[in-house]
UniProtKB/Swiss-Prot annotation:
Keywords: Disulfide bond, Endoplasmic reticulum, Immunoglobulin domain, Secreted, Signal. Interacts with VPREB1A. Interacts with SYNV1/HRD1 (via N-terminus); this interaction leads to increased IGLL1 ubiquitination and degradation in pre-B cells, possibly through a lysosomal, not proteasomal, pathway. Residues 1-30 form the signal peptide. InterPro entries: Ig-like_dom, Ig-like_dom_sf, Ig-like_fold, Ig/MHC_CS, Ig_C1-set, MHC/Immunoglobulin. This is Immunoglobulin lambda-like polypeptide 1. Residues 105-209 are annotated as: C region. It is found in: Endoplasmic reticulum; Secreted. It comes from the Eukaryota. Selectively expressed in pre-B lymphocytes. SMART domains: IGc1 (SM00407). GO terms for cellular component: endoplasmic reticulum; extracellular region. The keyword Ribonucleoprotein does not apply.
Length: 209
């Protein structure tokens, strides 16, 4: 379409205005897909402005009621609703256009179980206490050990949080002593701090007899 002398952008049809904008930006060759609402169901959106396999910033235009991402040739299409969510969330478009939104998993307090050393462990001249912490979310916490009320760090080993099948987390913490160190003390405690709350479990060598 040719522009007549004196014709302004305000009189140009909307489609031509968008095309002219792309020409001015020099991005016509980079436009691969502009999605319509009917084609959105065939795309899977990772998130607003996200592009799988690329960390480069994305350019968005607003020709209508959708936000469209201008992406390089060969990349898959992406689109998102015009009204973006006000707080962070994960969302996907899949199947026949069904959108799944995960607003955030609720907090879950940890379940703490403290295990005494096994008889076989003690016969090998070792005493390993196991503090199993499970069912917590978010997946960050602190595990501390005490012997007769005194904090200890020597002989302590704690695993990194691992995700359970229910999307909650679990960790294991170990306190390893030699048998001679195990018997003289009366109380061993595992203390877990999660989201400002503390859970403590204790055992005694007398419980092994």
């Amino acid at each position: 379409m040719k522009l007549r002398v004196g014709q302004t952008l305000g009189t140009i049809p909307r489609q031509c205005e968008v095309l002219l904008l792309l020409l001015l930006l020099g991005l016509v060759d980079g436009v691969h897909h502009i999605l319509s609402p009917s084609s959105a169901e065939r795309s899977r959106a990772v998130g607003p402005g996200a592009s799988v396999g690329s960390n480069r910033p994305s350019l968005w235009a607003l020709p209508g009621r959708l936000l469209f991402q201008i992406i390089p040739r060969g990349a898959g299409p992406r689109c998102s609703p015009h009204r973006l969510p006000s707080k962070p969330q994960f969302w996907y478009v899949f199947g026949g256009g069904t959108q799944l939104t995960i607003l955030g998993q609720p907090k879950s307090d940890p379940l703490v179980t403290l295990f005494l050393p096994s008889l076989k462990n003690l016969q090998a001249n070792k005493a390993t206490l196991v503090c199993l912490v499970s069912e917590f979310y978010p997946g960050t916490l602190v595990v501390d050990w005490k012997v007769d009320g005194v904090p200890v760090t020597q002989g302590v080993e704690t695993t990194q949080p691992s995700k359970q099948t229910n999307n909650k987390y679990m960790v294991s913490s170990y306190l390893t002593l030699i048998s001679d160190q195990w018997m003289p003390h009366s109380r061993y405690s595992c203390r877990v701090t999660h989201e400002g709350n503390t859970v403590e479990k204790s055992v005694s060598p007398a419980e092994c007899s």
